[in-house]
């Protein structure tokens, strides 16, 4: 039987840059007088010959679907003819085009790819399915896939807000160890030097609950407490906007580049838009020990903040996980009216964990005392055992002798951790150990202390200072005297 061979002209070649999932060949025609004859037609694609029976070309359109397969490193040189369409590149799919020829001839190789023969795998089927999804579904499907592959990251800095963190002082006080281990070490050397000299460094703070970015200043009080703080926007952008209160628990982590997974620079794709960030959101409110790294991929030199209510409820917008953003725009309303409050967990294990964290935080305060009436009116009386165990053993022998009964005592520097201020008191022994000569003025009146309030003290050996903090107040409302204090 006579056979006819011909090459498909250039205008009939298949373009792999098309965004369509199926490309018909409409210009292949067979002479009507030879329809009954059995003919063989071959296609030449990138130097590879594919034989096809003419019967498979009798229909008006020959459908040639394009699906995605993983790239073959060994045959990467053969993929230079292939180009992903712009839409696929934006989605960041790490795949190459796959072409399959439909036909009834069992000898036809239907697994011809630009990289050579490759059997269909479970991944190919999954990518093929994703090609047929809408843009919104692809983002959701991709987000789900990435979420399962990403390693967990922790909220490395957690803090239960104190009164001084939310009042007029307009700063968030950080634990020195946390700040140095989880923030300072990741900053450029120049910024570290500035901070150690007392110069503030501008940072971007991403609110993980409201998907908003804010400016703050990270600095250190080098002349007084040596403490690290965030200010320059903390009060307005977080305390006021989020209505943070004393007792709220917040989480922080620094999203450094080395922590990112599939970073945008590595993938060569554009930054995540707001909807994608919403799709992949994993809130501190839902799980204080986990973050989803899509956030890190976008904010690679910033730190992120999430908040959680301890007193019964926590604030969050929107609900965690994958959410429907069809009714949202890129400019999201983050007003407090749109905040959703949901009950906190009732899981006994989580409750016990939170209580344990609070206990660990209070272990810094080796001396704790509930103020008596005389403490609020005259001087602070401390138990003999607590002073001898946690203060005297850290003093020089000559200083310890000055505290003996009948001696005037010694002057000690007392750093108020809540207000970031330093004061001087006299530690003496009068039937019991006391702090006097300024206690009533600089602490009771300035801080508005009352009978029943719980305070904490601990001695810092490296600076030879006594640290002070109000751990609990009988009346939670901030006193007027403290509100008027200048920062």
UniProtKB/Swiss-Prot annotation:
Residues 171-269, 379-474 bind DNA. This is Putative B3 domain-containing protein At1g78640. Keywords: DNA-binding, Nucleus, Repeat, Transcription, Transcription regulation. InterPro entries: B3_DNA-bd, B3_domain, DNA-bd_pseudobarrel_sf. Its main location: nucleus. It comes from the Eukaryota. GO terms for molecular function: DNA binding. It comes from Arabidopsis thaliana (Mouse-ear cress). Coiled coil: none annotated. One of its GO terms (cellular component) is nucleus. The keyword Nuclease does not apply. It is found in: Nucleus. The keyword Transcription applies. SUPFAM superfamilies: DNA-binding pseudobarrel domain.
